[in-house]
Amino acid sequence: TYLRAELDSLFSMTQEEELGALSLGELRELAGRFSVARQKDRFVARSKAMSFMAPGMGEFMNKDYGSGAALLAADLAVVAGTLAGAYFLLPEDLRFQQLDYLNTPWAAIRGRWESHTFMDYLPSMALLAGGGLVKGILGRLSSTHAGKLARRNIEQGKITFEPDLLLLPDGGMMMGMGWRY
């Protein structure tokens, strides 16, 4: 991580120096370096998390619009294909043409669903599980790609950060409140 590298660099340079011997300007510079390193780490983590949840979003964040669009389209295709396939593998009397879900009493809908065995639902459930697995693999690939993109953009100077000396805890609202992404 960027923060660990910055800390290692600091400790290798100032092993013999006492903390009290540092001037306020030097402390401010160190705090700025740490804040930039922390922002870099958070940017990479956020890119990866966004791409894992919605493949392509981390790529968009890193201005790789072609890969982002391709991964987002692949994700939408996997989700749509999985849902459509699972629907058509349901027993025929549960489909929308046979059962009006908006105007039929709940007890009748429940009775119809309970009239089938587990084996009747197995093909649909297997397709849902397979689609979920494919979506997870796609999210993992996209997350890894977005993390590499973020690191490359940081190293090439395409993404820059300014020192922020007000280092708040994760989430930033103090008193234990906050948000994470």
In which residue ranges do the predicted regions lie?
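N-terminal targeting leaders of membrane proteins
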Residues: 1-87, 108, 179-181
